[in-house]
Swiss-Prot record:
This is Nucleolar protein 9. It comes from Meyerozyma guilliermondii (strain ATCC 6260 / CBS 566 / DSM 6381 / JCM 1539 / NBRC 10279 / NRRL Y-324). It is found in: Nucleus, Nucleolus. Pfam families: PUF_NOP9. Residues 35-47, 654-691 have a biased composition (Basic and acidic residues). The gene is NOP9. The lineage of its organism: Eukaryota, Fungi, Dikarya, Ascomycota, Saccharomycotina. PROSITE patterns: PUM_HD. Residues 22-54, 654-697 are annotated as: Disordered. One of its GO terms (molecular function) is mRNA binding. Pumilio repeats lie at residues 105-140, 141-176, 198-234, 283-319, 332-369, 371-407, 523-557, 567-605. RNA-binding nucleolar protein required for pre-rRNA processing. Involved in production of 18S rRNA and assembly of small ribosomal subunit. SUPFAM superfamilies: ARM repeat. Belongs to the NOP9 family.
Amino acid sequence: MSQPRCFMQDLIVSSSPENFSITSMGPKVRGRRAPNRETREAKRQEDLVEDEQISEPTSNLTTPFFGLVDASEIEYFKSAESTLNVTSFESTEERDAFINSVLDEASGKELKLVTNQICSKLMERIILFGGDQQLISIFKSFSNHFVSLAHHKYSSHVLETLLVRIAGLVEKELARSAEDAADQEVTVEHLFITMMQEFYPHINEMITHQYASHVLRLLILILASKKLPSALTANSTLRSKKSKIARKMIEIKDNEDFDRSFETPPSFKDELKKVCKCISENKTMKEMRELSIHKIASPVIQLVIQVEGLVDKERSVWHLVFLPESNSEDPQEEAFVEHLLSDSVGSHFFESIIKNGGARPKYIERLYKLYMKDRIMKLARRSTTGVYIVQALMFKLRPNEVEFILDEVIPELSNLVSIVDNQNIDLGRSVIDASISRSNYRRDDIISQLLSKFAPNFNPKNPSQNDNYDLLENTLLLSSSTLGNTRDDWPTAEERRNALFLEKLLDYDTSFLLAVWTSFLAMPKERFLQMCFHGVFSHVVEHALAVIPASIGESKEVNILRKRLLNVFQGSIVSLACNAYGSHIVDKLWSFTVLMKMYKERFATEMKAESHKVKESTYGRLVWKNWSMELFLRKKYDWSQLIKVQDEEYHNEGAEAETERVKRPIELKMEQLAKKNEKSSLDSTNNDERNKRQRIR
């Protein structure tokens, strides 16, 4: 048991050379932020100076210092950045005039501005809003300094945005007539290629640089005419996770040039070939494999493998990482593949080159047969590494190999997927998708495995007997979730992921749909309504309000279950309609009450009784419109006709689905056997007739 420390002990500790602070002497200072104020202020001043300088975390590149921005200039540019952020311009011309005035003030200071933390945001906004000539002017001002800017913490982001906009200008240039192109002194294509000449001597440094590697990846995408992902998406190729969060916080949004590909001239393919050559030449297999599992370089090598086939039929980079397809098993390659299958960076690299289509199918099949086929289950149990490779293989191998993987995984699916431990949830989704792609291969086994895991007490043949909500608890973990919290907690990422998984199950088979209905009925009504008002779980409720198609048919027991679920909503329609999340559920109730006009009238009557409250709410007005409540109030017959049309469409869809229904594999196989038997019987009949004729003769 530790003894309490006295004041003198604290004084001695705080007075030691490494811990000495002003708090060890003088009067006691109140508050946690008061101590070390001078030290923090000095550190802040040092950071400001460092922010102005070129950051080079992993490069030996000697970069210039472009100078500090004056305090008065910072205030002006900060004000200009705020003005652009608000976008309170009456016209595009007014905004262009404002940008021109800012660029005039920034003339000759561009390099100093883009390497400043505050002013770099202004430059990025100007590039997003700027016109063609303004972009070209900024691009020219960066000439001979592109390498330095690519290696800087702040200017690298500005450069990425500029490159995306310049790619759009290159496409515009290609669409112009020959006369318009002749009037232009220097083409944007020429400017881009000139910039590439600056980068070539430094390509190998950029591969492993914290900031320049992102610029290099963007250059490769542009040269290959590939889609340039949005800088705000979760899996963006352009930005790191921290950068995407920062852009959202400072409200910098992409324009129409992002999240699309651009047409490029033939000369860009030559430049892409040079980039691939710079990366592959003079490198040994050991060096390339080290880059493949390098935290920063790995995404670059993934991208090069994806695009090198456009300009290099020999696939030089691929064959510096893996042996040719003609080679048999190799101990060194086996050790490298094992590292890829067990390392977080390596598994991400391996998954990417399998999924993104850069490698030829025969290359992937060779690696699979040599090093993975015999231990699929072992890899599937590696929930943070190998399982992602197994998932990727399900959609890239030949059908017979996909079925082999499914045969290995499906019997153990209930043991592999764990919501509580946050393991292999994506594997469950991938198995379902792979089964569907193979004409619902072993569908019943998958359903059985997942039901036994998440709803062990549910009987699909007699769903009404279910008196618990195991399925909801086991998939959404409601007891430990933010459901019912009064602290306005935001839904967590885990809750979103679990909800999406449950929605996947609801779409897969009606057994899960009925299990969720009975779970809703087993819950206390208050708890169920909390789900309806929850930012994530409300989507599950909305998704569960699906009627079994008429082609399958709704049994009497299922019809009763649907009515019981609708009864739960009675008395809460108005509060749901006026809520941001609940309003979507009320909208969905219109289709969920098909063939049940009585429930439609009950819910409409509830909204009519509190029409003022519903109409005063933004969400309530939308529900009022979607339910055609004005017709309900003034033209009840017309409202009833809408219901009649809905019921007829439901029956018609069922009839069409019955006539156009895709036959199941077992049905096709039975038809083939029937035709085969018919043919054999016909042949035997013909043979008998021939024998009879021969006897007669």
